[in-house]
Amino acid sequence: ADGLGLAKDWQLSFQEPASPLMEELINFHSIVFWVITALTIFVFLLLAYVCYKFSAKKNKVPSKTTHNSVLEVAWTLIPVLILVVIAIPSFRLLYKQNDFSNIDMTIKATGYTWYWGYEYPDHDDITFDAIMLTDEELAEGQPRMLSTDNMLVLPVKKNIKVLITSDPAGVIHSWSVPSLGVKMDAVP
C-alpha cells in the first residue's frame, strides 16, 4: 500500500500495524498504559490523603508507630505481582520477536555512513545499496528523509529474517520499520 508506514501530521499514536507482531505490541502497550495510569492515580491519591491526614494542623500529636508488618508485606508483594503480570506478556513478545523457526527468506542489511546495503542471500546473492535521495532528487509526493534510490522489496505474508550488521569502520546504525514492529541497532 502506498504510504504504509509513514507518520501523519499531528500523529500521536503508533503507525498502522502491518504485521501480527506489531498488532500484539500495540495491544501490550495499551494494557501497560492503563495499568501505569491506574497506579499513578492511586499513588497520587494516596499521597494526597497522607499529606492531608498527617499534616501538622490535623495531627497535633504525631504517631509513635514504628512499623506495620502487614502493610510492609503488602507494599512489597503488590508491586512484585504487578511486575510479574506485566512481565509475562512482555517475555512472550520478546520470544516471538526472536523466533526464527519458520523462516521463508533471509535479508542481510548492512549499515554504512548515510546509507544501507542489502543482500538477498537466498536468491542468487542479489546485492544493492539504498542511498537516501536529496531534496532535489525527490519526486512529487515522495517523503523527505525516507526515500531512497533503491527500495528493499519484501514479499507479503512471509516470515522474513533480517540479519542486521554495520560496516566495521562505521558507526552505530538503527534499522527500523515501525509498522512491522521492528527496530534493531547495528553495532560495528
Explain the meaning of each model-derived region.
Residues 2-31, 51-188:
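Non-transmembrane, membrane-proximal soluble domains of secreted or membrane proteins
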Residues 40-54:
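Alpha-helical transmembrane segments
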